[in-house]
Amino acid sequence: KLIFQFMGLKMEFLASKEFGYPGEQVPSELILTNPSKIPVSAISLKIYDKHYAGGDAAANEPIRVPIPLKLQVDQKLSQPYWLQKPVENALFQVGSQEKIGIPYELPKVGGFLSFTLGGEVFSLKVPLEYKFNDPVTGEIKEPFTVVPEVDLSLSKEVLFLVQGADATVSVTVNFRNTLLEGSLDFEGLTRDQYTIAGIEELPGQKQRIYKVIFLREDKETQKVVHARFTTVSGRVFDQTTQTISYPHIPSLTYFTPATLTLIQADWKVSGEKVGYLVGAGDEVPEVLSALGYDLRILGKDDFRLDFLNQFKAIVVGIRGFNTNEDLALHQSVLMDYVRAGGNLIVQYATSTPLVTKTLGPYPFLIGRNRVTVEGSPVQFDASHSLFSYPNVINQKDFEGWVQERGLYFATQIDARYQSPLMLQDPGEQSNKGGLITAKYGDGTYVYTGLSFFRQLPAGVPGAIKLFINLIEQ
């Protein structure tokens, strides 16, 4: 490799496309340029036990060798090494210690370039890449990526089988080649637990879209089911394909099981209108919509009391009081909404910078306290309406939380607030600032540092149930 670089040899092994599936024909080309006066001879490329001769390279004359590459039928996908085994306890499982620290998976497709120099034969491993010209950036190279011939995408990751919620999921089967005949089913469910209500094929697109309706059961359950497409020949495809792409680093494609979490619960959800004031960004609105609430994202023109009064509750997204200037301009309107009987729920904010220091109807400050152990003990006032209406909260509802309990708890809390929840990390003092609430006029105000923005998208039932209670006050 050093000799190759010292001579200034330039080599490219380029595919005609960025993605290919096992068994696919991918026309490729080997391009080698020798800028030195030292002759390089007997150039060849070996890939999949086949040799492709390129001859000799004269000075500054590029050699171009067409490679009629056909990927092996059992070619492994370009899955990053840290995702090749299931995650355990939030840790990636890497079998080979030598790979740890490598930022990208080693290329799955490549060959061995051999050449003769001064009577000596040299060999160099070369990866297959894809090159294109961007009109703005110029020449860009990306790794050639092996993907499934067929993959799936689901319109939802979590589905709530609760009264009033939409129990429909769209499953899109994407074909890299021609559309294959086959059937869709769900591992973990029997055929009488769901109905395929419709199948659509869009003209000119290599997709087949299944509309699936899941049926409610008589008991509360939570299960993860696996969507899979089986061809008439018995081939099974059950993965999603996702690509991370930024201009300053190579693209990274990875594959995950096409799973859907089904949560069957007898939760009491009114399905009324809920307003959402966006903060730094979270996925709580999508979860509330999936639960059956009539959700509306509020903008700067919506801060009118006559308009806000239609909402059962208004929720402020995470760090809303750090990022949303409209909250500073219209905080008084929100307080009027609460006084008139509204329900305002403020998710965590950091202590600085705040767009306004007035977060609630009575004084409190944002501290830096947090509880990082997601399974840490919890104490709460079971008689308080937040934990008893309309759904009864018990200790089991605090099991299965992810990553943490909460952060940026309230401190220096005015006596007019109630603190019905006590949290603490092991070996630490208990903290009452994770959830505070107060009556103000005819309405209710809540500030919470609980990590609902993590728990709700993850489908943690107890956290979802508690958030429903916050809305339904």
Residue ranges and their predicted role:
Residues 1-23, 131-162:
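Low-complexity, acidic Ser/Thr/Pro/Gly-rich terminal tails and inter-domain linkers that flank the onset
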Residues 32-36, 172-177:
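Asparagine-centered strand-capping/turn motif at beta-strand->loop junctions
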Residues 55-63, 199-208, 217:
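Short proline/glycine- and polar residue-rich coil/turn motifs
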Residues 60-127, 215-224:
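Eukaryote-biased detector of low-complexity, proline/serine/threonine-rich segments
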Residues 120-153, 235-266:
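Short beta-strand elements
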Residues 236-317, 350, 454:
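Aromatic-Pro/Gly-enriched surface loop or interdomain linker
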Residues 319-399, 462:
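A glycine-rich, often tryptophan-bearing local segment used as a flexible ligand/cofactor-contacting loop or short
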Residues 368-460:
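Catalytic beta-strand/loop cores that center a nucleophilic Ser/Cys/Thr
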